[in-house]
């Protein structure tokens, strides 16, 4: 009997706090996913980093042996300066000195990566004025970009998602949920084809050192706004039509980001995903909210009445102990 009561109480407790339990499992799952990614990346990339370090040490040792007139501190000072310049997008290589990083098209590309929070990091402001302007420009521009993207996605979603689903539901009598699922899958396939596979094939042709996998990797890293910066198009030596190419890439990134947001919004509107998301939300208890509001109002009213009573008490304390008589009464007393 006691066990059944304890079991039923535990079940009621779990059901009552189901949203909190689901949220706790969500946080735990996210942390485990982060740890899983760190373990995989470390196990895969660390051996390649070690090989690269060993290769660089051998090259450095061989270079010093062949050039005995050059000391190791001098070489390290030179290499440090070269690496520092490379971090700012400036290279000392003879085949990489023809492209400017801050002409208009490159600056336009940089501004688009800043506002979209992609931020490849291949080009950064050099001057203090440029860094200060970048801060101010981002503080204003990023919320402006979010507002712009929200407005565009809302309008595009109406014409691309809601109206087609409603048309097939009303005109042909199909189930709205089934039509929404099929439409979301088809829209995802079209978006991946138009903004991932086809651009990856184009980049693999236009960029000499990129294969299809590297081009697809760039498309995904860019449109997901990760922006690692290890692959940046239009930075090759003697790139043909470089200005036009940079403008085209800027338009591609903006349109691709809008397309990605439309697809995400389409999937988020699916009934099944809405039910799944509600598992992790705090449930709104209207009666409990009303009780809190009433208690807050009562507390506010009682505090106001207490303040009014305090004011009246102060006024009474300031009054004299013997109240002055009215003038009429005083005159009558003198007549008598």
From Swiss-Prot:
This is Potassium channel subfamily K member 1. GO terms for molecular function: identical protein binding; ligand-gated channel activity; potassium channel activity; potassium ion leak channel activity; protein heterodimerization activity; sodium channel activity. It comes from the Eukaryota. One of its GO terms (cellular component) is synaptic membrane. It catalyses: K(+)(in) = K(+)(out); NH4(+)(in) = NH4(+)(out); Na(+)(in) = Na(+)(out); Rb(+)(in) = Rb(+)(out). The record marks 118 as: Important for increased permeability to Na(+) when K(+) levels are subphysiological. Ion channel that contributes to passive transmembrane potassium transport and to the regulation of the resting membrane potential in brain astrocytes, but also in kidney and in other tissues. Forms dimeric channels through which potassium ions pass in accordance with their electrochemical gradient. The channel is selective for K(+) ions at physiological potassium concentrations and at neutral pH, but becomes permeable to Na(+) at subphysiological K(+) levels and upon acidification of the extracellular medium. The record marks 146, 261 as: Part of a hydrophobic barrier that is stochastically dewetted and limits ion permeability. Residues 117-122 are annotated as: Selectivity filter 1. InterPro entries: 2pore_dom_K_chnl, 2pore_dom_K_chnl_TASK, 2pore_dom_K_chnl_TWIK, 2pore_dom_K_chnl_TWIK1, K_chnl_dom. The chain crosses the membrane at residues 21-41, 133-156, 182-202, 244-267. Residues 1-20, 157-181, 268-336 are cytoplasmic. Keywords: Cell membrane, Cell projection, Cytoplasmic vesicle, Disulfide bond, Endosome, Glycoprotein, Ion channel, Ion transport, Isopeptide bond, Membrane, Potassium, Potassium channel, Potassium transport, Synapse, Transmembrane, Transmembrane helix, Transport, Ubl conjugation. There is a cross-link at residue 274 (Glycyl lysine isopeptide (Lys-Gly) (interchain with G-Cter in SUMO)). The gene is KCNK1. Its main location: membrane. Residues 225-230 are annotated as: Selectivity filter 2.
């Amino acid at each position: 009997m006691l066990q059944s009561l304890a079991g039923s109480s535990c079940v009621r407790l779990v059901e009552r706090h189901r949203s909190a339990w689901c949220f706790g499992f969500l946080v735990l799952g996210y942390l485990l996913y982060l740890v899983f990614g760190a373990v995989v990346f470390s196990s895969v990339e660390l051996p390649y980093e070690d090989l690269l370090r060993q290769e660089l040490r051998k090259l450095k040792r061989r270079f010093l042996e062949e050039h005995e007139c050059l000391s190791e501190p001098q070489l390290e000072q030179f290499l440090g300066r070269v690496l520092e310049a490379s971090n700012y997008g400036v290279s000392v290589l003879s085949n990489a000195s023809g492209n400017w990083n801050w002409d208009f098209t490159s600056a336009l590309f940089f501004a688009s990566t800043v506002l979209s929070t992609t931020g490849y990091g291949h080009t950064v402001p050099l001057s203090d004025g440029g860094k200060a302007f970048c801060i101010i420009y981002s503080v204003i521009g990023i919320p402006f970009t979010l507002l712009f993207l929200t407005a565009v996605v809302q309008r595009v979603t109406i014409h691309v998602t809601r109206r087609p689903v409603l048309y097939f539901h009303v005109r042909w009598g199909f189930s709205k949920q089934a039509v929404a699922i099929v439409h979301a899958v088809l829209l995802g396939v079209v978006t991946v084809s138009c903004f991932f596979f086809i651009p990856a094939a184009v980049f693999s042709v236009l960029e000499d050192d990129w294969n299809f996998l590297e081009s697809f990797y760039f498309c995904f890293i860019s449109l997901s706004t990760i922006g690692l910066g290890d692959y940046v198009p239009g930075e090759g030596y003697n790139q043909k039509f470089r200005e036009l190419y940079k403008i085209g890439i800027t338009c591609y990134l903006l349109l691709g980001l809008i397309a990605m947001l439309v697809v995400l919004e389409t999937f988020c509107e699916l009934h099944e995903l809405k039910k799944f998301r509600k598992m992790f939300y705090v449930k709104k208890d209207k009666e409990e909210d009303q009780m809190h509001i009433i208690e807050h109002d009562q507390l506010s009213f009682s505090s106001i009445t207490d303040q009014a009573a305090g004011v009246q008490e102060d006024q009474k304390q300031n009054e004299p102990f013997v109240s002055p008589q009215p003038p009429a009464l005083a005159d009558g007393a003198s007549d008598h």
